[in-house]
Regions:
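P-loop NTPase motor domains
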Residues: 3-223
Length: 223
């Protein structure tokens, strides 16, 4: 089998010496979100405010908020429409207000904010008319059950969702970050991919212009 792989690499012009130079020049890390099989990714411990450059672009900020709310509700099995779903509208307003105050939210903080939102009105309606407290409690319970589910702690461990750390080590060595999500359910895969791409877009928006290639994002086996 080793000979087969060696021949295949050689057919693509990848000699052993070239591969050895790559291995020496870069760090390779395999990330396994939601699992400790590789390096876990801490994706749910804190929903930090986007960088200032992204916050100043209302269209991008709105997209970040909607994607975050949609992805979280999908984890609960809720196919929430941003326009008609009161759950989606509530979460979107919570993130909008918190991030405007430059405050991050961990999952526990989000649960508390669902029960006691940092505002009294949504649109022109008072909060209790739009989303009564007993119904908000049910939504908070669903998030709490998710947090308490066996194995869920793996989503709260490991390296933070930080694009800079995915590209370079602490010593400045280039890093090839490989994310494997084959062990996740379809819903969990979509959640992780959405959150990762959100972070990448936010990182891109903070970078100054350049004519040099900074990073490559490659996605394999998309169905």
């Amino acid at each position: 089998q080793a000979d087969l792989w060696r021949k295949g690499l050689a057919d693509w012009g990848q000699a052993p010496e070239r591969i050895a130079r790559l291995k020496k020049a870069a760090d390779f890390t395999v990330y396994t979100p939601g699992s400790n099989a590789g390096t876990p990714v801490n994706i749910l411990r804190n929903f930090a405010p986007p960088p200032p450059a992204l916050q100043q672009d209302r269209d991008l900020l709105r997209e970040r908020i909607q994607t975050t709310a949609t992805s979280l509700l999908a984890l609960l099995g809720l196919d929430a429409d941003p326009i008609t779903s009161r759950e989606h509208i509530l979460l979107s307003n919570i993130f909008d207000v918190s991030w405007a105050q430059n405050q991050g939210l961990d999952l526990a903080g989000l649960i508390r904010a669902v029960q006691d939102p940092p505002f009294e009105r949504i649109g022109v309606m008072d909060l209790e008319s739009f989303f009564p407290s007993k119904d908000r409690f049910q939504l908070a319970m669903r998030f709490n059950n998710l947090l308490a589910a066996p194995g869920f702690e793996a989503w709260l461990e490991g390296d933070p969702l930080d694009v800079g750390r995915f590209l370079y080590t602490a010593e400045g060595k280039p890093r090839a970050s490989i994310f494997t999500i084959s062990h996740l359910s379809d819903t969990e895969r979509m959640f992780f991919v959405a959150m990762l791409l959100n972070e990448i877009l936010g990182w891109v928006r903070t970078q100054p212009g350049t004519s040099s290639l900074r990073a490559i994002v490659y996605m394999d086996e998309i169905f």
